[in-house]
Amino acid sequence: MASLSTSVVASASSRLWNPAASNGKICVPSASLSLRTGCRRSSSSLTSSASSQLLHCSFLSSPVSLASPFSGLSIAFDLSSQTSGLNGQRRRGLVVRAGKAALCQTKRSRSRKSLARTHGFRRRMRTTSGRATIKRRRAKGRWNLCPKSNPSSGKRA
């Protein structure tokens, strides 16, 4: 099976200074844009079918950049007008893939206070008496279930 493909890649990055940060960090977000075309030829059937032309764009974050809702996202546009399948349906023109951290920020850029809050809640849920305490506070209608879970951890000395 022979395969022929061409790829054109362009990338861009810009340096931004964040005046809100006290230590004057430089943020380096970067994005890449690539155009992929290709042609596949099968040796068993002497027909050639061109694979879809994709315009692919991805947003990458660096360790010094600010958290952005676009970091970890990947977008691809299908530029070909070919049909696929037996019933002749058109392929989708836009494909968006998002990483886990970009969707709900499970691991990145969480404050010390929010980490301490979850730690206090999980510590209460570990024991029988802690679970009973949370159950009583829920029955009472409390919004803050664990008020004593490191309240000053958001402030750094």
UniProtKB/Swiss-Prot annotation:
Pfam families per record: Ribosomal_L34
An example Gene Ontology biological process: translation
GO molecular function (one): structural constituent of ribosome
Keywords assigned by UniProt, alphabetized: Chloroplast, Plastid, Ribonucleoprotein, Ribosomal protein, RNA-binding, rRNA-binding, Transit peptide
GO (cellular component) term, any one: chloroplast
Compartments where found: Plastid, Chloroplast
Stored InterPro entries: Ribosomal_bL34
Recorded superkingdom: Eukaryota
Annotated transit peptide: 1-97
Role of this protein: This protein binds directly to 23S ribosomal RNA.
Subunit structure: Part of the 50S ribosomal subunit.
Name under which the protein is recorded: Large ribosomal subunit protein bL34c
Organism expressing this protein natively: Arabidopsis thaliana
Gene name as annotated: RPL34
